[in-house]
């Protein structure tokens, strides 16, 4: 319990699977894995990466790093809080 989760979602359409991600956020919370506030949606995934998985736009590296930095921050914060005990 009390370990953070992060949601990456994708779709072939313009919304990047965010509707499914919102449902997953509720499920993860019930499992004791609160999700970080940010999600990383990948809209039009067929255009976002080439066949080798290389991002078509250099901005994906920046987005990914910021997303993982946030996950790491929450992991460290929740680890420190767990050392003090759980809320129940």
Where are these regions (language model features)?
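Helix-loop-strand module that forms the ligand-binding subsite of alpha/beta enzymes
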Residues: 1-32
């Amino acid at each position: 319990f009390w370990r953070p989760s992060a949601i990456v979602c994708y779709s072939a359409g313009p919304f990047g699977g965010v509707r499914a991600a919102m449902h997953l956020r509720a499920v993860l919370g019930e499992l004791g894995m609160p999700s970080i506030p940010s999600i990383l949606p990948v809209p039009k995934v067929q255009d976002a990466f080439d066949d080798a998985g290389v991002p078509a736009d250099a901005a994906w590296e920046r987005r990914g790093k910021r997303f993982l930095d946030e996950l790491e921050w929450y992991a460290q914060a929740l680890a420190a809080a767990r050392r003090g005990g759980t809320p129940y």
